[in-house]
Amino acid sequence: MGSDETSTSLLRRIGRRVGRRIGEELAMPPRRCEERYRHELKYLISYGQKADLNVRMAPLLDHDSHARDGSYTIRSLYFDDYWNTAYQEKVDGVLTRKKYRIRIYDYSDRVIKLERKRKSDSWIYKEDAPLTHEQFDRILAGDVGFMEHSEHQLCREFYVEYVSNVLRPRVIVDYEREPWILDAGTVRVTFDMDVRAAVDGFDIFDRTLPTLPVLEPGKLVMEVKFTEFLPQIVRDILPGKAQEITAASKYVLCYD
């Protein structure tokens, strides 16, 4: 874990490599079969900016119905290979990359998802496959043989990477997410608060794991995801400081 100054420096360093101004023309997404890529913008903002944005968004966007109390807790266990490829490619600003994680919500085992997030420039594509609590425990114990012949292609590919590239757990990332949506979810704005790294374990169901904050005090990550184009009414309310645009990676921040 680094200091607040180190975290901020890392965010700005990565942001300079892959960031772009909102007004610039967006690159076309990769075309691979029927995969649906979404554009993703990230900002490092203050809680004061968030309060102002909430007021401006309220007449335009709706709270995501999945957030019963306005927000929910996300806990993700990130994996990386023997060479820490996902980490290194992110820091180096490699435009096309991927990472694996297992994600739960509000510390519950009701929904457990194995996810793979692929990124090409500023476009993202996410795949997921369901897991049971027992299957998660087996993965954590290194028993991944059951995934070799899974009905889910993502599980089979995870198995291959686990065996051939020594894919292993690296860090647990926690944060509180407040989600907003527009046009039935084609535009999604989220505020990720209290981003922290768990230490001393990889069991995502262990609520007693100690955690450490990774952002400087008073800061949070705002994400804007959309397909094809971003409506002008949303563009008009986005943070205006170009230097705040960043490719903040929670995995990189927490792994450090």
What label would you give each PLM region?
Residues 1-256:
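Phosphate-end processing signature that detects enzymes handling 5′-triphosphorylated RNA
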